[in-house]
Design a protein with these regions (language model features):
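Short alpha-helical segment of the dimerization/phosphotransfer core of two-component systems
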Residues: 17-22
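Conserved micro-motifs of the catalytic ATP-binding
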Residues: 37-42, 79-82
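A conserved beta-strand-to-alpha-helix junction within the catalytic ATP-binding
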Residues: 43-57
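Conserved catalytic submotifs in the C-terminal HATPase_c
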Residues: 45-46, 68-78
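Short helix-loop "hinge" at the ATP-lid/N-box region of the Bergerat-fold HATPase_c
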Residues: 98-99
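Short conserved segment of the HATPase_c
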Residues: 130-142
Length: 200
């Protein structure tokens, strides 16, 4: 049976919106990951933290409606200069990485804390954790399926995480990963908060 016209128009609108977002994201991503020996810089615009997190959660819930994400963000107003499309993609990649690879996960958390003049982003899970021998090379793109446990957990992470690392590096920061004492893994990066350098 054909969908009602109103629903068809709504779906078409969502498809167009997602397509335009994807095109912009890919264009920005290509500018960050190009290999030409030049220093890569991103165009930063002050972004309200609440709006960024809401956008990430909305996109994530469309693909993973049954996966709850616990959020912990400051109550105060926070703006952060960034390329929001790329930072959204980093957070989405990290959340989806947990869904696909954190075997045994029952809790997924996205948190932001303020430390001095920085906003520290963390994506944490309570799943299987990351093999110790993989932690040092997990962002290099060389962590292939053969390096993962035989049961396939935490496999095929290298390419996506290397892109995350490139995006964060282009923002003047570094992404790290470590295993949690209580089980699972946490991925972390920090961005400068809004101030004198907004928009640069």
């Amino acid at each position: 049976d054909a969908l009602p016209k109103e629903q068809q128009l709504k779906l078409l609108g969502e498809i167009q919106e997602d397509s335009e977002w994807l095109i912009r994201m890919v264009e920005n991503l290509l500018s960050v990951t190009r290999i030409d020996g030049a220093k890569v810089e991103v165009v930063k615009t002050p972004i309200v933290l609440d709006e960024l997190i809401d956008s990430v959660l909305m996109k994530f819930s469309k693909k993973h409606p049954n996966q709850k994400v616990i959020t912990q963000i400051p109550d105060e107003f926070v703006d952060i200069p960034m390329d929001s499309l790329l930072i959204e993609q980093v957070l989405l990649n990290l959340l989806e990485n947990a869904v696909f690879h954190a075997k045994g996960m029952t809790e997924l958390t996205l948190s932001v804390s303020l430390v001095g003049d920085k906003a520290v982003f963390e994506v944490a899970d309570n799943g299987c954790g990351i093999p110790d021998d993989a932690l040092q090379k997990i962002f290099s793109g060389s962590y292939e399926k053969s390096a993962a446990p035989v049961d396939g957990t935490r496999s095929n992470m290298g390419i996506g995480l290397s892109v995350c690392a490139a995006i964060v590096k282009a923002h003047g920061s570094e992404i790290t990963a470590e295993n949690r004492k209580g089980g699972g893994a946490v991925f972390r990066f920090a961005l400068e908060r809004g101030g004198e350098d907004d928009g640069q």
